[in-house]
Amino acid sequence: MGRGKIEIKRIENSTNRQVTFCKRRNGLLKKAYELSVLCDAEVALIVFSTRGRLYEYANNNIRSTIERYKKACSDSTNTSTVQEINAAYYQQESAKLRQQIQTIQNSNRNLMGDSLSSLSVKELKQVENRLEKAISRIRSKKHELLLVEIENAQKREIELDNENIYLRTKVAEVERYQQHHHQMVSGSEINAIEALASRNYFAHSIMTAGSGSGNGGSYSDPDKKILHLG
């Protein structure tokens, strides 16, 4: 967890106050040195402790820096407040941004073929070169995307071919299974018919033999009528 926010107020304990002063003073001197080195700024720092001890830092001669400060304060050209300086800076930056926006808008209109009447031959040539470069980049990107789409389509075609092969294999397996099952059923039916025919044949033979022995071994035709004489 982060450290809690320290309340900025006078430290009552003198020992703690002195320890904090030493730490903060060293940090302040370090920051002043870093500012002078990183930003090539002329920095002068003067600190008096509660006991009246002087601490100072200057990347240049501190007296010359103080004199420069006095001169800057007395110079009428440097009497502007910080707010006025900031306002002037932001006004300049705002004007620069507006100019950049206007330039970009004009350039876009030129690329669209508008507002060309005010351009010279050289400027028109520059617009033409920009368009050619833009078209070249667009075509290159389009070609790249088309290659990706073709590659994806080829991969999809291979996947579909593999799926078709798999489905045809499964269909062939089902057809072979059905054909084998049909052959087994047909063979069983033929065997059953042959067995039934065989049983009927033997039963008919036995009945025929029994009828022949009861009539003295003579063949009796049931369709013939017997004439009895009185």
UniProtKB/Swiss-Prot annotation:
Keywords: Developmental protein, DNA-binding, Nucleus, Transcription, Transcription regulation. Gene3D superfamilies: Transcription factor, MADS-box. It holds the Pfam family K-box. It is found in: Nucleus. Residues 221-230 have a biased composition (Basic and acidic residues). It comes from the Eukaryota. SMART domains: MADS. Residues 3-57 form the MADS-box domain. Residues 87-177 form the K-box domain. Residues 211-230 are annotated as: Disordered. InterPro entries: MADS-box/MEF2_TF, MEF2-like_N, TF_Kbox, TF_MADSbox, TF_MADSbox_sf. Its main location: nucleus. GO terms for cellular component: nucleus. GO terms for molecular function: DNA-binding transcription factor activity; protein dimerization activity; RNA polymerase II transcription regulatory region sequence-specific DNA binding. Interacts with AGL15 and AGL16. This is Agamous-like MADS-box protein AGL11.
